[in-house]
Structure formats: C-alpha cells, structure tokens
Amino acid sequence: MAKPDKVDAVTEIAERFNTSTAAVVTEYRGLSMAKLVQLRRALGEGTTYRVAKNTLVKRAAEQSGVEGLDELFVGPTAIAFIEGEPVDAAKALKEFAKDNKALVIKGGYMDGRPISVSEVESIADLDSREVTLGKLAGAMKAKMNQAAALFAAPATKAARLAAALQEKREGGESDAS
C-alpha cells in the first residue's frame, strides 16, 4: 500500500510534467541548502526547482507519459520545471553549474521528447524572446528607413534636377543679355 504523502508527491510531480513547457534534470550532490536557495532565486518565478526521490519521479514521469528519462534518474535528482520560455531558466542553470561544479545538468524533456545536455546548453546559448523581438524590430525599422529613403530619392533627384535647370536658365539668360 502506497503512503499518502508519496502518492501526493507523485501526483504533484506528474502535474508539473504536464503543465511545464520544459523540464531539466540535474544532480545536486554536494550543494548546500543555501546554494539551492540561491539557485531557486536565479531560476526566477516561472521555474520550480524540485528535489525528489528517483522512484517517485520515475512513477510521475510514467504517469504523465514522459518517456526516455529513466537513465537520468540516478543519484540525487532535482528537476527544474519550466513554465514559459525555457531560455532564461536554461541560462540560469548553465551559469550556476559553471560557478558551482556540484550542480550537474543531466538532460531534460521539452516538446514531448527527451533532450540531451548539449541541447540544454544550446537552449541556454539562445537569445531570450525579448532580445530576439528587439533585434527583429530593429531590423524591420532599418528596412523601413531604407524603403523611405528609396521612395524619397526620385523626388529629391527631380527637385535637384529642377534646381539645376533653373540655375542653367538663369545663367543662360544673363549670358544672352
């Protein structure tokens, strides 16, 4: 008979798997509670960092239909459940792991499939959504400015031509006199 607290834990983890856009599995062996708190703060509001027993996580993953992660659930396991954009959380995990060698990124789950450590790091290397939108807006503005200059060029050219003809006529009339 399963204990109610374990059933609740499995249900909670399964729900997190279902509601998260991504999950990153880590090993936290050797991290102090203070470091774990620091990591949770670095991850931000959209990410929940949950330490759990491997057997409970395996059951929750199975219950959620998450496959391909069983080999990651070895040793002290904690999972970062990411709701929203995974880039910022992946960056925070990568930076924290760089500064704290005790945190090891094992892999993750995103878009219905397992992802490797290198894929998590690739996600961390991407620009955030806001930065990408800013770059796109800048590129669009530059193209609009180019288009405006292109459309204004014939009118400017015609005005210069008219001014040159006017000067030529005025110069020609003064020579004829």
UniProtKB/Swiss-Prot annotation:
Quaternary structure annotation from Swiss-Prot or TrEMBL? Part of the ribosomal stalk of the 50S ribosomal subunit. The N-terminus interacts with L11 and the large rRNA to form the base of the stalk. The C-terminus forms an elongated spine to which L12 dimers bind in a sequential fashion forming a multimeric L10(L12)X complex.
Instruction: Write the record's keywords in alphabetical order, separated by commas.
Output: Ribonucleoprotein, Ribosomal protein, RNA-binding, rRNA-binding
Which InterPro entries does this entry report, sorted A to Z? Ribosomal_uL10, Ribosomal_uL10-like_sf, Ribosomal_uL10_bac, Ribosomal_uL10_bac_type
Which family is this sequence assigned to? Belongs to the universal ribosomal protein uL10 family.
Fetch the PANTHER family from UniProt: 39S RIBOSOMAL PROTEIN L10, MITOCHONDRIAL
The UniProt transmembrane annotation reads none
A GO molecular function annotation here is: large ribosomal subunit rRNA binding
Its protein name is Large ribosomal subunit protein uL10
Q: Which cysteines are joined by disulfide bonds?
A: none
GO BP terms in the entry? translation
Main function? Forms part of the ribosomal stalk, playing a central role in the interaction of the ribosome with GTP-bound translation factors.
> Which terms in the GO cellular component ontology are assigned?
ribonucleoprotein complex; ribosome
